[in-house]
Amino acid sequence: MKKQFLIALSICVSTISFAQITSTTPTFGVRAGLISSGIRGDASNNLDNLLSFANGAITTSNHTGFFAGGYANVPVTDMVSLEPGIFYAEKGYDLNGSLNIKGVGFLGANAKAKLQSTYIDIPVLLKVNISGFQIFAGPQFSYLMKANLNTTAGLLGFNLLNSNMDATQQFNRWDAAVTGGIGYKLGSGINISASYDYGLSKLDANKNANAYNNAIKLGVGIEF
């Protein structure tokens, strides 16, 4: 995976260098937005089975996070460009549980677990621009900076447990994904985009569990 990361950086440098020796001029931009992330694979299927057994007492939801960073847009033709970038991205997964047994529901017993992982994402996109409308796809290489697991439990409105654990060592530090999406760019350089990341690398550091990152990103950016 480290080799793939170096390849991604080499592509970024090569595309910008290529533009400098042709008549095209690269533009640079910044982009930020929201991420809705989750997991897929055997681990997700096992969790779904647990949810069915719990009959609604446990619910899951995608983790909502934030991403921000910069990119270079390097024209190849009038309609096609390469866009390498580097972004800070928050990903993860949320799990909520409640005890609603008849006669003791007034106790308000509940538990929550939230996994928040912070990554550095390096996408290298091939982008097609048609009168402002954009279609793009390409590989993305990511490095896990930190994974934090927060668990809480409560009863009668009181917090009985509030634990934060550094879970970084439990996860693969390197991740690879395929990303693609659509967007629109205004004449002023302001652009909007929606994309989907499909993880290809196992999240488990020991590679025992088949769990992979998935994420939907909605972003707003501007090019200079």
Regions flagged by a language model, labelled:
Residues 27-29, 184, 212-224:
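Outer-membrane beta-barrel "beta-signal"
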Residues 72-74, 126-128, 143, 184-186, ...:
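Residue-level signature of outer-membrane beta-barrel architecture
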Residues 34-38, 88-92, 130-132, 141-145, ...:
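Transmembrane beta-strands of outer-membrane beta-barrel pores
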Residues 21-23, 77, 89, 130-133, ...:
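Outer-membrane beta-barrel channels and translocator barrels
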Residues 20-72, 133, 223:
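Short glycine/proline- and aromatic-enriched beta-strand/turn motifs that initiate or cap beta-hairpins
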Residues 80-82, 132-135, 189-194:
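Repeated loop/turn-to-beta-strand initiation elements of outer-membrane beta-barrel proteins
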Residues 38-63, 91-118, 144-175, 179, ...:
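Extracellular/periplasm-exposed beta-strand and loop segments of Gram-negative cell-envelope proteins
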Residues 29, 67-69, 81, 121-123, ...:
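Membrane-embedded beta-strand positions in outer-membrane beta-barrel channels/transporters
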